[in-house]
């Protein structure tokens, strides 16, 4: 019987594994790779604000974390993640760990899920370098621009260009990102593919647990829910106006506050029909889904959001819930009556009208099943198998 070569997958990620209790595309990718028969292990390489007690820490079955200490703890110094001189020497323990691999007949693949530590692609003889691009990294998430954000943009843009040019294959989570990557290549565009975000279908579609309605603080009626990281890219002002116009609706927010004290989010929370639960364990998210009538994705108009394809779209649909999204052009092709309504702009009347439209068949089992069927085609395992085909990694295992 033929013995497959063992593979070590090194994933460059934006943050430590358990930060904010959120699970992004990169976490699902790491777990998928760790579960493959030929995988020896996955190493999660990430920046960290402080030095770690151990160089390598097990964070999940088959996944170890190697954290690279930031230049300084303040956000303004994060440019060090993209500038070789500030991190090169900190990668030595990782390279030492990988050195015996080739001698043992093992293959090493490098996955970039954000454009940090670009020099790593040249410091080792990788079998494959893959860039899984899921954000417009150089654009400010808030949509605002200043001297500091312009400096940050240039540093990140330069780092990302190096990774794009070095990568053997590139996958993008939206058509917009695909086009942006294509612009940076003079040749080799055939190595770029679009693979949109997916869903852990069984987790969200099979939930039978009764929801804890005490979360709604005694409120009855229609519930609109946002579940995920609460960040400056969201349009809190528009939602505030909508909440004022629809006092009988409840606006439920589930997730960690990453707004850096955004005043508009704090003002929103003062309204009596707005509830914020704080962070939630990822395993509990399907239970929160049962509380809501409409999943909302209220994004601002900004260059950053042009590229976004939210994780939550297919999670809401897998739970049988209709969805309303704003200023997410990558999702406009998903529009379907009583399934997904897409709105451009920041007028609360348009948002309210879209919500009322999807409520037209609220509770109808035919439409619930239609939503689930759409989500079923986007199961993460199917999408990652497609990515593996594009890379050709398993073909040579």
From Swiss-Prot:
Gene3D superfamilies: Glycogen Phosphorylase B (3.40.50.2000). Pathway: Cell wall biogenesis; teichuronic acid biosynthesis. Its EC number is 2.4.-.-. Induction: By phosphate starvation, via the PhoP/PhoR two-component regulatory system. GO terms for molecular function: glycosyltransferase activity. The keyword Glycosyltransferase applies. One of its GO terms (biological process) is teichuronic acid biosynthetic process. It holds the Pfam family Glyco_trans_1_4. It is an enzyme of class 2 (transferase). Keywords: Cell wall biogenesis/degradation, Glycosyltransferase, Stress response, Transferase. NCBIfam families: TeichurnBiosyTuaH. The nature of the anionic polymer present in the cell wall of B.subtilis depends on phosphate availability. Under phosphate-replete growth conditions teichoic acids are present, whereas under phosphate-depleted conditions, at least part of the wall teichoic acid is replaced with teichuronic acid, a non-phosphate containing anionic polymer. The synthesis of teichuronic acid is accompanied by degradation of teichoic acid and reutilization of liberated phosphate for other cellular processes such as nucleic acid synthesis. Belongs to the glycosyltransferase group 1 family. This is Putative teichuronic acid biosynthesis glycosyltransferase TuaH. It comes from Bacillus subtilis (strain 168). The gene is tuaH.
